[in-house]
Amino acid sequence: MKSVLLVLSCAAILFQPAGAKPQSAEPVKHGGKIETKYDGFNYETVMRLRKMKVNCDGFKDKFKDACVSIEVALHCPGTQVNYVKHVSVQVVFENKDWVRLHSPDQRDFSIVTDTETLRLGRMSPVAKNQPGTWDTKVEVLEANIPYATFKKIAASQSVELQVGRDAVELREKNIAALKDLNSRVIVPTATSSN
């Protein structure tokens, strides 16, 4: 009787239902597209959150029908994805009719997170792919920031982007996309030597 009970208890432990085992986390549904590509010309691996809309309601108390989007890229030297050299952030301003371009003195970039304001310097305009064209409906500004600063932004509950006098707050799905992008960096585990 004892041996039957012992065999049954061992079998119960070995064949536990799948519900008792820890489940892997489901991917976050934020609507953003994240891609990883190796750039052979610059000898780096780029993990990029493709252009993602933040707001199409205009800026705070200004310019209705204006859309703001972001694109973020993590630049990792070589073919590895466990060290990020720097992060490039692009802020895209679009309008149906025209965009009031930011003059050089109105390109100061700062990000307000839960607890602090991060002043990240001056943004620069991104060159268009088509030479000889001038699109008055789109303005793309870019800034390079340290990875440590990006980690602070991705870990925040609320994030507001400020370019000059214009400010826009990221939505929950935008913050979730930044967290997802940051989670793709492989963090080396600490090994203990005995």
Predicted regions and their residues:
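Mid-length scaffold segments of soluble, non-membrane domains
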Residues: 89-130
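An ectodomain-focused feature that recognizes extracytoplasmic/extracellular
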Residues: 21-102
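Extended Gly/Ser/Thr-rich low-complexity repeat segments
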Residues: 67, 102-111, 155-163
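Internal interaction segment
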Residues: 122-194
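Positively charged n-region of N-terminal signal peptides that target proteins for export
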Residues: 1-4
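Short, surface-exposed loop motifs enriched in S/T, G, D/E and P with embedded aromatic residues
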Residues: 22-38, 49, 113-132, 170-172
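Bacterial N-terminal signal peptides
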Residues: 7-13
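C-terminal segment of classical bacterial N-terminal signal peptides
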Residues: 13-19
